[in-house]
Design a protein with these regions (language model features):
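N-terminal helix-turn-helix DNA-binding core of bacterial DNA-binding proteins
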Residues: 3-34
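Compact, glycine-rich, soluble single-domain proteins
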Residues: 31-34, 40, 68-70
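Basic amphipathic alpha-helical segments that dock to polyanions
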Residues: 39-49
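Solvent-exposed interaction patches of small proteins and small membrane subunits
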Residues: 25, 31, 56, 65, ...
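Non-DNA-binding regulatory cores of transcription-related proteins
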Residues: 65-143
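Beta-hairpin "wing" of winged helix-turn-helix
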Residues: 49-65
Length: 143
């Protein structure tokens, strides 16, 4: 599983919005070093996923519209359109020619178990904790 650049940018946008204030796209792009055209694309997804609210006009801007304590990294990845599977055979509807010919696949079973553990770990990490967590990047005990 890899967190794409798009999800990385989404996390950076949410980090700016942690203060509860409205921010312009230009400000967020400059602060978080996100190309402006990508920021707009990402904000559309975050807005469609009800994570942020975007208002237009002179007093417009972007602000959080979700509870970051109740929203997980797994949720964000879903909003961004990431399936987050370890292997293509984990995709829904994937037809494995090997399993069709030979039956049960031990590799698939082991990867499925790892996939479940990974999904559980990503579900257990709130966005607030991820974005505002402690100062030691090696310490994941509180996550």
């Amino acid at each position: 599983m890899i967190i794409t650049k798009e999800t990385d940018y989404a996390l950076r946008i949410l980090r700016v919005l942690l203060d509860g204030e409205k921010h312009s796209v230009a400000e967020m792009s400059e602060t978080e070093l996100i190309p402006t055209q990508f920021a707009y694309q990402i904000l559309r997804k975050l807005s469609a996923g009800n994570l942020v609210r975007v208002s237009r006009g002179a007093l417009g801007g972007c602000e959080l519209s979700c509870d970051l304590d109740a929203t997980s990294l797994y949720d964000l990845m879903g909003v961004m359109g990431e399936r987050g599977v370890l292997c293509a055979c984990m995709e829904p509807g994937f037809e494995c020619r090997w399993q069709d010919k030979h039956g049960r696949c031990a590799i698939h079973c082991q990867l499925a178990a790892l996939q479940r553990k990974q999904d559980e770990a990503f579900c257990a990490v709130s966005l607030r904790k991820l974005l505002a967590g402690g100062s030691d990047p090696q310490d994941t005990s509180e996550m």
